[in-house]
């Protein structure tokens, strides 16, 4: 569903082409769908599979015909009823009913020893009964909408089982969920489409939307508060009658008003009274990890002693190559740390927002045979420094405190300003296929990130010159 004003703009500007980012997302979705379809069982003596093709109407009719014929597995299904339609990656028969199948590039479930979630290997979908797996479901609204609409389409033919199948970044596991859990949210989302807004409001997705060039001038003419506080972040001020950035400034509400003024004046960062430089050490390294979706970490980049050291694999993740690469990185890091301590010197490894690194340190250790206590000892030690926590304590900014926001203020510049996390996902796919230019771009991007971390801490240690007080 997403931004409802996009539907208005789509009618106004039907010829505006899709952005590169949206085309890349579509390519990734197609690749995910193809990967799952290749795993699903083929037709056999007692199992019939049909792969639908053709235009939208042809697939809608073929979906109904295949269900009427009792086909066990139907891929590329489509329903259209009552003003809505839904594209499904498949339908799988269960007794006299069907389950809608969706393939998502989200992480749809997380391992949890205290939870259970029914699931089945993807290649056994439609052939084996689900088993309780130690996972906890993760909710993503758009996935829930598709499952609910798929269930409603099945209800029109009295073939709804009440359950659906979702396959996420782990393409080899299909999880079974209760589709009724998504009905209420989907009904609310559909209801909002009956009363479309007459003006835009900035949300996170605007950055990659093809209609932003038309919405931005409208928002600027209105001085809309969402320019500064996108999405629901400005709701509490709207409820107080404050709808513009200038109105928030004049309200004199302390930090929010000061940051609104900084936004209006183009000031990216202000120094808090609690400013303090980060911990420093005799031996220092900066670390940044790159992962591909939820499949694994393929690059551990390190800046040490004025040089960049990438520990990288371009092979598919989850196998020996990823394990060998992580072992090489972990051995290098622990040996450097141990040697430093043996000399009686201090050691510090820095990263910017450690959540991702901590996750993949733990996950890699679990999958590739490194003792968890080694990882936990490092993560919880003073030698592992999350620079973002120092930045958060020391600064406030109207655009947040991401690495891409803070590092330029500290004097750092990336080789490619517009190469971001989504671009890296696209480049990773090309790199695995052997594209040397994509590999070089990923290494350059990662090198820029570790250098940015280094630059920020050096700048903070010098007192963050040039930054005004909050």
Predicted stretch roles:
Residues 1-97, 107, 431:
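Metal-dependent nuclease catalytic cores that hydrolyze phosphodiester bonds in DNA/RNA
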Residues 16-21, 225-281:
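N-terminal accessory regions of nucleic-acid-interacting proteins
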Residues 54-58, 250-255, 417-430:
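Short linear loop/turn motifs
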Residues 56, 70-113, 119-180, 311-425:
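Conserved DEDDh/DEDDy metal-dependent 3′-5′ exonuclease domain
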Residues 62-72, 274-285:
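Structured nucleic-acid-interacting core domains from mobile-element enzymes and related host factors
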Residues 149-156, 160-222, 406-470:
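Acidic, Mg2+-coordinating catalytic module of metal-dependent nucleases/exonucleases
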Residues 281, 289-328:
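Metal-dependent catalytic core segments for phosphate chemistry
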């Amino acid at each position: 569903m997403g931004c409802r004003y996009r539907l208005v703009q789509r009618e106004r500007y039907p010829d505006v082409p899709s952005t590169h980012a949206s085309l890349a997302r579509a390519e990734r979705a197609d690749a995910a769908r193809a990967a799952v379809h290749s795993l699903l069982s083929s037709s056999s003596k007692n199992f019939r599979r049909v792969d639908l093709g053709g235009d939208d109407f042809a697939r809608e009719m073929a979906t109904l015909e295949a269900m009427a014929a009792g086909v066990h597995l139907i891929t590329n299904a489509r329903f259209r009823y009552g003003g809505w339609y839904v594209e499904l990656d498949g339908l799988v028969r269960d007794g006299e009913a069907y389950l809608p199948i969706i393939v998502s590039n989200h992480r749809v479930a997380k391992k949890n020893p205290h939870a259970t979630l029914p699931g089945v290997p993807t290649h056994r979908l439609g052939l084996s009964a689900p088993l309780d797996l130690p996972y906890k479901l993760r909710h993503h609204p758009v996935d829930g909408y598709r499952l609910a609409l798929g269930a409603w389409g099945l209800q029109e033919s009295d073939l709804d089982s009440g359950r659906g199948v979702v396959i996420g970044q782990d393409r080899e596991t299909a999880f079974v969920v209760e589709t009724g859990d998504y009905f209420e949210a989907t009904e609310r989302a559909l209801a909002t489409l009956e009363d479309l807004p007459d003006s835009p409001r900035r949300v996170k997705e605007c950055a990659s939307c093809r209609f932003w060039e038309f919405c931005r001038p409208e928002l600027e003419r209105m001085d809309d508060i969402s320019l500064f506080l996108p999405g629901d972040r400005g709701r509490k001020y709207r409820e107080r009658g404050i709808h513009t950035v200038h109105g928030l400034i004049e309200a004199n509400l302390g930090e929010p008003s000061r940051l609104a003024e900084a936004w209006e004046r183009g000031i990216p960062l202000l120094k808090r009274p609690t400013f303090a430089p980060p911990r420093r050490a005799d031996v220092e390294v900066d670390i940044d990890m790159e992962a591909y979706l939820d499949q694994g970490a393929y690059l551990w980049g390190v800046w040490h002693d004025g040089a960049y050291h990438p520990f990288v694999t371009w092979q598919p993740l989850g196998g020996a190559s990823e394990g060998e690469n992580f072992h090489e990185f972990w051995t290098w890091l622990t040996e450097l740390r141990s040697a430093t301590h043996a000399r009686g010197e201090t050691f510090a490894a820095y990263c910017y927002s450690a959540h991702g690194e901590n996750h993949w340190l733990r996950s890699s250790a679990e999958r590739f045979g490194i003792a968890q206590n080694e990882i936990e000892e490092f993560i919880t030690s003073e030698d592992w420094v999350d620079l973002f926590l120092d930045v958060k304590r020391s600064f406030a900014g109207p655009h947040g405190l991401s690495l891409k926001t803070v590092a330029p203020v500290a004097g750092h510049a990336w080789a490619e300003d517009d190469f971001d996390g989504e671009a890296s996902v696209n480049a990773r796919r090309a790199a695995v296929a052997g594209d040397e230019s994509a590999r070089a771009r990923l290494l350059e991007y990662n090198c820029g990130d570790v250098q940015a971390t280094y630059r920020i801490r050096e700048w903070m240690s010098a007192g963050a010159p040039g930054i005004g007080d909050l």
